[in-house]
Amino acid sequence: MESFRQVKNNNVDLISNNDPLDKNRLLIEDLWESVLREECPDDQAERLIQLKELSYSKQIDGDSSKTFKNEIVDIVNSMDLAESIAAARAFSLYFQLVNILEQRVEEDRYIQSFTNKDVQKSPDNLDPFAPALARQNAPVTFRELFYRLRKLNVPPGKLEELLQEMDIRLVFTAHPTEIVRHTIRHKQTRVANLLKKIQIEQFLTKEEKNSLKTQLKEEVRLWWRTDELHQFKPSVLDEVDYALHYFQQVLFNAMPQLRGRIAEALTDNYPDVQLPSESFCNFGSWVGSDRDGNPSVTPEITWRTACYQRQLMLERYIIATSNLRDQLSVSMQWSQVSSSLLESLETDRVKFPEIYEARATRYRSEPYRLKLSYILEKLRLTQERNNLLADSGWKFDLEGETDNKNLDKVESLYYKSVKEFTYDLELIKNSLISTDLNCESVNTLLTQVHIFGFSLASLDIRQESTRHSDAIQELTNYLDLSVQYDQMSEEEKIKWLIDELNTKRPLIPSDVHWTKTTEETFSVFKMVKRLQQEFGSRICHSYVISMSHSASDLLEVLLLAKEMGLLDQNSQKSKLLVVPLFETVEDLKRAPEVMEKLFKLDFYRSLLPKVGESFKPLQELMLGYSDSNKDSGFVSSNWEIHRAQIALQNLSSRNNILLRLFHGRGGSVGRGGGPAYQAILAQPSGTLKGRIKITEQGEVLASKYSLPELALYNLETVTTAVIQNSLVNNRLDATPEWNQLMSRLAETSRSHYRKLVHENPDLLNFFQEVTPIEEISKLQISSRPARRKKGAKDLSSLRAIPWVFGWTQSRFLLPSWFGVGTALSSELNLDPQQIELLRVLHQRWPFFRMLISKVEMTLSKVDLEVARYYVDTLGSKENKDSFDNIFEVISKEYNLTKSLILEITGKNKLLESDRDLKSSVSLRNKTIIPLGFLQVSLLRRLRDQTRQPPISEFFLDKDESTRAYSRSELLRGALLTINGIAAGMRNTG
């Protein structure tokens, strides 16, 4: 059996001596094998190493695929439970080490691209009929982008106007939740840092390098002895802690650098263009505020989340301010100080006599240090007050509190707003400037304050539309209206809602006991008002309505907001931005009609916030990728979202309203995921205009934000794509022939997808039996239930996340490609010459290119031989014929789709033009095979035991007790394989 090193050395086309990924992969291989040999029994370690080597060496040697896979199956089926669990853990560890390595290499490549100033590439090779720059698959840096824009004669004024209006918001979510434990993430960070040190080998002595390798191995050995599985179902606050980890460890320090890189790139190409605002790229969060289908997200949880976010920011500011105090040792003996700063010191001396007495002697000639001591005390008092609020809950009224002796002091001296903190820092900055000093640390802290404030990220409230209509229905029942709300037509609802919105008298009685659900719906709005009073409007000003179907869905939320004091009728201003989320294909088609009804209502238009120098009203709209894909398939979902954007932008322009589109993209292709750069470039022209809002799913946070340079790479990628799309107009969206072709492809694809998924009565059983969907639900990874309705087992109740997760685990990846081949084939059957048009679209239309690229990448991860094994082994005998038929339909569609994708792209093999991606996917596809077979083996044994009749514990003999224990261990083994495959595939749902 050849080792990985031997295989690579014997196949020169698979490795480049200069490729850092291949070079360091050998280090990972040696590390993995070394850890197994030290942590596992000798025979077990050798067998696991042999199993992995078998998976790729046989394929490279040209062995029959079926033959070598049978060898793997034989080995897997011969393993006892302990060895199976060890194998699952070993392969999971391997893939996570490879992931860390690839992230490190990506980080290094970004550093090289950023530091490389030789970007003077001619744009002459760009197709003049395609959007300039859009044919570049790889993201460009700011320096390269601005150089090319200059070569394309983009006027400085046009670029500056865009930069000043630019508003990019990345919204962190917990769904799908990260499958890797927080504890493991910390270990991965330490491993990444050690790898980084080892990779600068030219600066290391032999002893230093050996020492680092020893530390690396010990860290991985500790990892091996750590439980990979969550021991309990995480609470919402656990999820909050996980998401905020990236702000604490990476983003707080990385964000100021992003603007700095724009400044440097502008200096080289557009020296007179003004920088965007410090907060041009900012953050939102759904973690702790998204209550759609998650009963654990209560008003109290959202309140505590806001307090926790402020706590983290105050901690960071205290550290930064303390560091500044150490740094700013300027003495009045040798430097002047502004009069404004000196006056502020006198004011602070009166307010903080204890600080003055403690610090005045030490800092008697060091005014900056004294000022920063006062600032530190204000921050600590703000922190003390925040802790009190967090412990007391959102209903607690500080003004009515009389028992706390320290409260008076806290209330009078804490920072009441981030503006007060900014003012103090500006005093220091301006004083330094007045004496010809420029402290970069002060500038950095000010930038951080502008970006994060005290709230860190805005919390979007999300709730499903029927929760509001149900609450209003209960209210109207109590009011005994002549026509009950649920009996009204849509037009009648709109009229009644507008009338009530214009009425100044309250509608909701204060002394009525509502049902628990309605009371909580009302309480959310009350809590939001309290949040805004305490934190300012920035903390929570967007209310997303999932499953929006009609204009009344938005007006209902506005009515409830009015009743809770979030709408000022006198000034006609709303403190809440109501955001409809259009999710299904039918709702996407209906979205322009819904918004047109609302835009015609003067009352509604008057409530929209006015933004920018133009002071135009702004409407935010969210587009859902997950449910539309689950509903109608990949092509139909993407095309209807594309069409909806164009229609909504045209509608907004006609009504002189600015539009901000909120893209609810998931981590996987089947939920709108994929490379952000390509996705943003593929947006219809005129729909961005420098404004975009995008979800960042929990499962991709680590791959984007775990390392500083990775975070900057992702942020620069998103920003350059937004600038590029906004400035380089793409008129091809309006080409009637292309649009008509896409509409036909979408409809045919949708029909074929729905015929299998929604119309085949056996598909649900197929999905439940041949994928680990039921076992996935037992993973303690999310506070949110996998199904929308408790106890429901129908497809409509299953969330899109576990839907995609199950297909990914079993190597079908069906939601990301099924129906594409039939749609393309139908066009070619009508006219074979259409292949030329499809090739033109692939070359010149970013949207179509993005579609084909995503399908190609997904197809490269599909393994129907492994999928067939899931069907044959896990499918029940009584369903064999129907399951065989379903598999045949899937297999036929896969082969058709693959052949046509290759024909359109002009390639011989998938991913042929992307060497790095092909190498990564190829390694994973080969090495993950044993893990799939192992999962099937464990699932089969687990389900066989589960089907046995339960036995009362009072009658358990020794053997039966062992059987019960083994069932638990089998589940554990199965869950470990789910972890491993998720790491190998690099996504869950």
Curated annotation (Swiss-Prot):
Its EC number is 4.1.1.31. The keyword Lyase applies. InterPro entries: PEP_COase, PEP_COase_bac/pln-type, PEP_COase_Lys_AS, PEPCASE_His_AS, Pyrv/PenolPyrv_kinase-like_dom. It holds the Pfam family PEPcase. The active site is at 175, 630. GO terms for biological process: carbon fixation; oxaloacetate metabolic process; tricarboxylic acid cycle. GO terms for cellular component: cytosol. It is an enzyme of class 4 (lyase). The keyword Hydrolase does not apply. Coiled coil: none annotated. Its cofactor is Mg(2+). It catalyses: oxaloacetate + phosphate = phosphoenolpyruvate + hydrogencarbonate. It comes from the Bacteria. One of its GO terms (molecular function) is magnesium ion binding. Belongs to the PEPCase type 1 family. This is Phosphoenolpyruvate carboxylase. The lineage of its organism: Bacteria, Bacillati, Cyanobacteriota, Cyanophyceae, Synechococcales. The gene is ppc.
